[in-house]
Amino acid sequence: VHWSAEEKQLITGLWGKVNVAECGAEALARLLIVYPWTQRFFASFGNLSSPTAIIGNPMVRAHGKKVLTSFGEAVKNLDNIKNTFAQLSELHCEKLHVDPENFRLLGDILIIVLAAHFAKDFTPDCQAAWQKLVRAVAHALARKYH
């Protein structure tokens, strides 16, 4: 993936404002609520019976933070996203058997969360840069599936 200087600035500038715990928890909760079939990967998380239960579930919040923290590694390593996610790709493919389409869904949800939290800063140019980033991350995570 080639990044222009402007794209890098838009991504890193917004990332500096992101509350990883809050946005990560919200993104994962939204994934589990909007796409309920993804809940099967989180059976060990306990009560996922309703949107309220999911939003209030401490394991969802903790894993959401973990997911977005690892996403931050992509922001730090824009020029080496494939290698940054090589181990996570292997884990999700070979051990967890996660459908790689779910990575794309989570990326789309992250875009929605960022737009909701940073409406003024989330310009069309910023959205385009972030859309490119979430696609690159989803592709890197799906790499071991090919």
UniProtKB/Swiss-Prot annotation:
PROSITE patterns: GLOBIN. GO terms for molecular function: haptoglobin binding; heme binding; metal ion binding; organic acid binding; oxygen binding; oxygen carrier activity; peroxidase activity. The keyword Zinc-finger does not apply. Coiled coil: none annotated. InterPro entries: Globin, Globin-like_sf, Globin/Proto, Hemoglobin_b, Hemoglobin_oxygen_transport. It holds the Pfam family Globin. Residues 2-146 form the Globin domain. Red blood cells. It comes from the Eukaryota. Gene3D superfamilies: Globins. GO terms for biological process: hydrogen peroxide catabolic process. Heme b binds at H63, H92. Keywords: Heme, Iron, Metal-binding, Oxygen transport, Transport. GO terms for cellular component: blood microparticle; haptoglobin-hemoglobin complex; hemoglobin complex. Heterotetramer of two alpha chains and two beta chains. Belongs to the globin family. Involved in oxygen transport from the lung to the various peripheral tissues. This is Hemoglobin subunit beta. It comes from Vultur gryphus.
